[in-house]
Amino acid sequence: MVPEYSRFYNILGYNFKDYTLLIRALTHRSKTKKNYERLEFLGDSVLSFVIAEVLYKQFTDLAEGKLSQLRSKLVKGTTLAQLASSLKMDEYIILGASEQGGHKREKILEDVFEAVIGAIYLDSDFATVKKVILKWYQPIISSINLDTIKVKDSKSKLQEILLQNALSLPEYSIETIDGKDHEQQFTVVAMSKDLNLRVKAQGTSRKKAEQKAAEKMIEMLSQQGLHEKK
């Protein structure tokens, strides 16, 4: 164990065998090309699957759409930044000169949180990283009350994000309708003129296609650091 990381290992609840993986997970691209971005990509997928599985098993009567919305709430934005801070990740982030003072930035905290998950997965195995993730998330998941929680649909959430950032609302239009009457496939385009964004999605109804397009745009906004403010 590297002495300066022994406290951090205790907070995480995991001891790295290859501490260089942790170093990379904490290193921002402003510091070096050997940064956390690839680990973030991996950790994002691992986290999404683990949370999807636990929600599927815990909320057996919840429909697919609501499960997706609840998962999105748990694996994006403020939730990740808060978890990263609670695990003291902000104290160990390695930044270049151009990003000094960015340890508390929500987007950086989100990215590092996912990167650390990716690093733990590579350093161990899926069962181990799953156990670690569930330990971190246990207080959040155990406090979920479906009677009081309000999970917004993607279009409502997108509208809220844009309004909170003084941006015009998106416009939806049908590009094509393919297939026979009983098995039609709708292709919908969602546009944000202020952000010059255009996304396309498909669904078996106009409503479903619009929801999917809104979800894609939310993901793009998240990558730009725009999230729903609580």
Curated annotation (Swiss-Prot):
Pfam families: dsrm, Ribonucleas_3_3. Its EC number is 3.1.26.3. InterPro entries: dsRBD_dom (IPR014720), RNase_III (IPR011907), RNase_III_dom (IPR000999), RNase_III_sf (IPR036389). It is found in: Cytoplasm. Residues 153-223 form the DRBM domain. SUPFAM superfamilies: dsRNA-binding domain-like, RNase III domain-like. It is an enzyme of class 3 (hydrolase). Keywords: Cytoplasm, Endonuclease, Hydrolase, Magnesium, Metal-binding, mRNA processing, Nuclease, RNA-binding, rRNA processing, rRNA-binding, tRNA processing. One of its GO terms (molecular function) is ribonuclease III activity. This is Ribonuclease 3. It comes from Francisella tularensis subsp. novicida (strain U112). The lineage of its organism: Bacteria, Pseudomonadati, Pseudomonadota, Gammaproteobacteria, Thiotrichales.
